[in-house]
A protein has these predicted regions:
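Membrane-helix interface segments
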Residues: 2-4, 89-98, 123-124
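Residue-level signature of the transmembrane alpha-helical core
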Residues: 69, 100-108, 127, 131-135
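Membrane-interface loop-to-helix entry segments
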Residues: 64-78, 124-132
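"…centered on the first transmembrane helix and the immediately adjacent amphipathic helix/loop
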Residues: 1-73
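Short, charged juxtamembrane terminal tails flanking transmembrane helices
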Residues: 149-153
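Membrane-interfacial alpha-helical segments at the cytosolic side of multi-pass membrane proteins
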Residues: 74-88, 132-147
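Small-polar-interrupted transmembrane alpha-helices in polytopic inner-membrane proteins
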Residues: 11-16, 95-115
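Interfacial helix-loop-helix junctions of multi-pass membrane proteins
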Residues: 108-129
Length: 153
């Protein structure tokens, strides 16, 4: 089971790497497409007559928060996966610290990697969002894990 957990962690890291490896134009197309398929559709439910100009305005308005939410979510899941791996190898007291350290270092390396991609840059703000997402994932899963452990005793 340890190997399976490690594989999921590495595959998730590879997914994050693949997103970071996209040029800015390609990354924006994905974000804008997602916003068009979700947020714009929701707007259309409540307001049938949305012009193309209004659609573009909606996309522009929501691009930044959606992209940051994507960072948070990817690293929230990474935090859970790191926790599951570290749990198999770590003393309970250091579980959260080691899990968070893995995620923080990966977030730093991810931002460093983006320096070498056309149109991309590194952002300390993104590292902070990523780390916070990881901390939330780790914390929620830790609490959930504690409650399950108490019930089984």
């Amino acid at each position: 089971m340890k190997v399976v957990k490690i594989c999921f962690l590495v595959l998730w890291m590879a997914l994050i790497f693949s997103f970071s490896n996209q040029r800015d134009v390609d990354s924006s197309k994905i974000s804008d497409g997602f916003i068009d398929r979700t947020v714009v559709k929701i707007y259309k439910v409540f307001n049938e007559n949305i012009t193309k100009e209004k659609e573009n305005e909606i996309i522009e308005k929501y691009t930044y928060p959606i992209r940051k939410l994507a960072h948070y979510t990817l690293y929230f899941i990474l935090g859970i996966l790191a926790f599951l791996v570290v749990k198999d190898y770590s003393i309970n007291k250091k579980l959260i610290i080691y899990s968070l350290l893995i995620c923080f270092l990966y977030a730093c390396s991810d931002e460093f990697h983006q320096l070498f991609i056309i149109g991309r840059s590194a952002s300390i703000k993104d590292v902070m969002i990523d780390t916070f997402g990881s901390l939330c994932g780790i914390s929620i899963f830790y609490i959930f894990n504690k409650k399950i452990s108490k019930k089984s005793v």
